[in-house]
Design a protein with these regions (language model features):
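Solenoid-like repeat scaffolds
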Residues: 377-386
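Hydrophobic, small-residue-rich alpha-helical packing segments that form membrane-like cores
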Residues: 314-318, 325
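Low-complexity, Pro/Ser/Thr- and charge-rich linker/hinge segments at domain boundaries
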Residues: 16-32, 109-147
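Short coil/linker segments at helix-helix boundaries
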Residues: 205-237, 270-275, 293-310
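Short, solvent-exposed loop/turn and secondary-structure capping segments
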Residues: 211-214, 247, 253-256, 332, ...
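Short beta-strand-plus-loop segments that form exposed binding edges in beta-rich domains
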Residues: 1-3
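Aromatic (Trp/Tyr) and acidic
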Residues: 36-105, 110, 128, 133-197, ...
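Carboxylate/His-rich catalytic cores and anion/metal-binding grooves
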Residues: 229-251
Length: 604
C-alpha cells in the first residue's frame, strides 16, 4: 500500500494485469479486529483497533451495551511496521458467555463468541481437512460432508495401472511398488515423505499434548466408532503410506509423484503415471522419527501396528547409522517436482536430529543419545533455527524432545532448555512489544507458508510454557492462534469454514466449491513473492477476497493457473489473469494443517 493509502495498479511488461487491493481498515476490512471465532471466558480478550477506541462499546447479540472502553484500558501501540496500520490494543476483560460486537463511531468489528467451548468446532474442522486429502479412496456420504455441504469423489483415486513405477528405471517401466493410503500433499495430487512424515508426527504430538481433546466418533470418518480416537485413525492413513516406501535395506524412497504436475481433478480422474522417487536420507530420517513415535502412541490401541512401526523405525535408524552422508533423491529429466530437503540449498541435519530424538525417546537407543549430543554441539543447532522453524529443519522438535526428557544427562537437557528459552524469550518480546497485532513474525518473516511458520513459532512457545511453567509463553502462543483466526491486519480467519474464513480456495480438488470444505489453512501473506500487493506492508501481501471472473476469461477453478502457458513470467504472476487466486498465498498443504492441529491442542 502506498503512503497515501491509494490502491496500486500492478503492471507486468506492457500489460496492466490486476489491481492490488490490500486490506484497508474501514474500507475493505473492519477497523476493529477480533478473533472471528471468539475467546474462551477465562482467556484475555485482546482486540486490535485501527481507530481510537476510547468510548467504544461492546454490544451483546440483542444490541444492548454491556461495557464501554475506558481510556485506562487502552494501549496506544502506534504504527505497526508489518501492516502500516495505526494500532490500539484493548483487553475486553470479563465477558459472560454470548455473542458480541464492538463499535467505535462508524467502525465495527465482526461478531465473535465468548464461551467455554468456543474452539471445539475449529479443532474438528482442522482435523477434518485430512479426510478430504485422502488418496486411494472414494469420498462418500455421510463422511464427505460439512454443515450440509457435500464434497464427494465418486471413485478411489490413484489406484490405476500407472501407479508405483520405480523412478530409478525412468523412462522404462520395469519395477513397480505397491503403495497404500496417504494424503495428497497440497492442491496437487503428489505425495512426499518429507512433508507427510512431519505432518503425521505433528498430529501424534497433538494427541499426546492434550489427549482429552481427541475422541472416537469426533470427525465423522469411516473409521469412527472403532474405539480409537479419530485423530489416530486419520494419522494412520498417512503412516501406512510411509511404511509402503521402505526398501529392505531400511532406506525410504522420497515420494510418489508425477513427472510434471497433476491435472486439476477430480482426483479420481487423474490417470497420470506416478513414479516412486529414489532413496533419500532426509526422507529416511523423518520416517524413522514419526514411526518411532507411532510405535508408542498406537500400542494401547493396536499392538501389532505399533510393532510394525517400531520394526520399520529401527531398520531406518540402522540404515542412517551406517550411512552418515546426505543421500539426495533425484528426479526425472525436465521434471517440475520439488525435492524438498534434497534440494541443493538444504541438508539432512534437522531430519537426522529429530530421528535421533525420537529413536531415543521410544527405544532408549545408546547410539541415538550419542547423536543427540553431537547435534546439540553442532553450530547448525542454534537459537535461530529453533526460533525460525520450517518443514526443512526439524531441529526445534529435536530440541523439544531433549528439553522435556527425564533420562538424558542433565548437561544435555540444560543445553536444549537454554536454546528453547532463548527462542521463546525472543518470540515473547516480539509478541508483547514488537508487533501491533501481537504476531510473532518479524517483518522479514512473511514468505511462502507464513501461516504455517507462524504456528511453528507458537508451538515453540507452548513447549517453553510447559518446560518452564511460564504462563507468559502460553499467552504469547495463544496470540498466534488469535492471529490465524482473524485478529490480523487482513481482518479474516485464515482457515476455511472457521470464523470469517476464505469463501473460496482455488488450489484444491474442490476449488470451484462455494463454500469450500472445512479446515483448510491457507499459506498466508507472502511478501517475498507477492510484495507488489502491499509494497510497504508485508503482513498484507495477500488479497482478502477472490473475484469470480478472471481478467483472462479463464473461469476460476481449482488449478486454473496450471493452464497458463506463461505461468512463471512476470515475477510469479501469470500474465493475462488476475492475481487473487494465486497459489503463493492461497495454496493449502497438509503440513500447514498439522501445525494448526498441533497448536490448537497445545493452547487449549
Amino acid at each position: 500500500m502506498s503512503g497515501d493509502g491509494a490502491v496500486k495498479t500492478v503492471q507486468l511488461g506492457k500489460q496492466v494485469n490486476a489491481q492490488a487491493a490490500p486490506a484497508q481498515p474501514g474500507v475493505n476490512v473492519p477497523a476493529i479486529k477480533v478473533d472471528t471465532v471468539g475467546y474462551p471466558e477465562a482467556w484475555p480478550k485482546v482486540v486490535v483497533f485501527n481507530v481510537n477506541p476510547e468510548g467504544a462499546v461492546v454490544k451483546d447479540a440483542g444490541g444492548q451495551v454491556v461495557t464501554t472502553i475506558e481510556a485506562s484500558a487502552v494501549v496506544d501501540f502506534g504504527l505497526d511496521e508489518a501492516s502500516q496500520d495505526p494500532v490500539w490494543q484493548v483487553d475486553l476483560g470479563t465477558l459472560a458467555a454470548g455473542r458480541y460486537t464492538i463499535e467505535a463511531g462508524d467502525a465495527a468489528s465482526d461478531a465473535f463468541e465468548v464461551g467455554p467451548s468456543v474452539y471445539d468446532q475449529a479443532l474438528v474442522a482442522a482435523q477434518k481437512h485430512f479426510y478430504f486429502q485422502r488418496t486411494r479412496t472414494a469420498l462418500v456420504e455421510p463422511y464427505a460432508t460439512w454443515e450440509g455441504d457435500s464434497y464427494l469423489r465418486a471413485n478411489a483415486s490413484h489406484v490405476h495401472e500407472d501407479v508405483g513405477w520405480d523412478l530409478l528405471d525412468f523412462p522404462a517401466k520395469k519395477r513397480k511398488w505397491t503403495v497404500e493410503g496417504g494424503w495428497h500433499d497440497a492442491g496437487n495430487f503428489d505425495m512426499y515423505i518429507p512433508s507427510t512424515a512431519p505432518t503425521s508426527q505433528a498430529l501424534l504430538m497433538a494427541y499426546e499434548a492434550n489427549p482429552k481433546l481427541f475422541a472416537d466418533n469426533q470427525l465423522n470418518i469411516p473409521e469412527s466408532g472403532n474405539g480409537v480416537p479419530d485423530i489416530l485413525d486419520e494419522t494412520r492413513w498417512g503412516l501406512v503410506w510411509i511404511l509402503s516406501l521402505q526398501e529392505d535395506s531400511g532406506v525410504f524412497r522420497a515420494n510418489e509423484a508425477v513427472v510434471k504436475w497433476t491435472p486439476e481433478g477430480p482426483a479420481d480422474t487423474d490417470k497420470t503415471e506416478r513414479w516412486i522417487a529414489g532413496p533419500s536420507s532426509s526422507a529416511t530420517a523423518k520416517a524413522a522419527a514419526v514411526l518411532a513415535r507411532a510405535s508408542t502412541v498406537y500400542r494401547p490401541f493396536d499392538a501389532a501396528f505399533a510393532d510394525r512401526c517400531a520394526a520399520s523405525a529401527k531398520k531406518a535408524w540402522a540404515w542412517l547409522e551406517a550411512n552418515p552422508e546426505h543421500l539426495r533423491a533425484s528426479k526425472a529429466p525436465d521434471s517440475d517436482q520439488p525435492l524438498w530437503d534434497d534440494e541443493p540449498e538444504f541438508n539432512d541435519f534437522g531430519a537426522r536430529f529429530i530421528a535421533a530424538a525420537e529413536t531415543w525417546r521410544a527405544f532408549g537407543d545408546a547410539s541415538a543419545q550419542a547423536k543427540l549430543e553431537a547435534a546439540l554441539a553442532d553450530e547448525r543447532c542454534n537459537q535461530k533455527e529453533v526460533l525460525g522453524g520450517a518443514w526443512a529443519n526439524l531441529s526445534r522438535w529435536g530440541v523439544a524432545v531433549v528439553a522435556t526428557d527425564t533420562k538424558l544427562p542433565k548437561a544435555l537437557v540444560d543445553k536444549a532448555r537454554g536454546l528453547l528459552r532463548g527462542a521463546a524469550d525472543t518470540l515473547r518480546e516480539r509478541v508483547e512489544s514488537g508487533d501491533g497485532y501481537r504476531c510473532a513474525s518479524g517483518p522479514d518473516d512473511y514468505y511462502w507458508a507464513h501461516n504455517s511458520n507462524l504456528l511453528e513459532k507458537a508451538h515453540v512457545l507452548t513447549v517453553a510454557a510447559e518446560v518452564f511453567d511460564e504462563p507468559a509463553y502460553l499467552a504469547a502462543a495463544r496470540d498466534q492462534w488469535h492471529w490465524i483466526l482473524g485478529r490480523n491486519p487482513n481482518g479474516y480467519s485464515m482457515v476455511t469454514r472457521v470464523g470469517k474464513g476464505p469463501t473460496r480456495i482455488y488450489h484444491m480438488e474442490w476449488g470451484n466449491a462455494e463454500p469450500p470444505p472445512p479446515g483448510y489453512l491457507v499459506g498466508g501473506p507472502n511478501y517475498s513473492n507477492m510484495g507488489f500487493l502491499a509494497p510497504d506492508a508485508p503482513a498484507k501481501a495477500l488479497l482478502w477476497d477472490n473475484p469470480a471472473p478472471l481478467r483472462s476469461g479463464v473461469p476460476a477453478n481449482a488449478m486454473w493457473h496450471w493452464k497458463q502457458e506463461d505461468l512463471w513470467e512476470g515475477g510469479f504472476v501469470p500474465e493475462g489473469s488476475w492475481t487473487e487466486g494465486w497459489w503463493a498465498v492461497t495454496e493449502p498443504d497438509i503440513i500447514y494443517n498439522a501445525n494448526l492441529v498441533l497448536v490448537g491442542a497445545s493452547v487449549l
